[in-house]
A protein has these predicted regions:
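Long, C-terminal-biased catalytic regions of enzyme "large/alpha" subunits
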Residues: 1-82
Length: 82
């Protein structure tokens, strides 16, 4: 699966980038809000949704999906910082 970066170039989807970004935002938030398992679940859900679209997905679309999943856990402050 391909993603479309902000500069218009395409790159292969890498689930680890979501895990790293959410983990970093969570750590920067002070006390951890999400468990590693919750972060993995978010990343896997986003990967599943992107695959279902059957097209290249923009970074912005992925960010929106991640934010929505973070908010679904009740971690609204973290979603804002992400």
């Amino acid at each position: 699966m391909k993603i479309i970066k902000r500069n218009g170039s395409e790159e292969t989807f890498d689930i680890q980038k979501i895990v790293v970004a959410v983990t970093k935002a969570d750590k920067d938030n002070g006390e951890r809000t999400l468990t590693d398992s919750q972060i993995e679940d978010i990343a896997e859900y986003v990967e599943f949704k992107c695959n279902k679209l059957n097209r290249a997905v923009s970074v912005e679309e992925i960010q929106d999906m991640v934010e929505n999943q973070i908010m679904a856990t009740g971690a609204f402050e973290l979603a804002r910082k992400y």
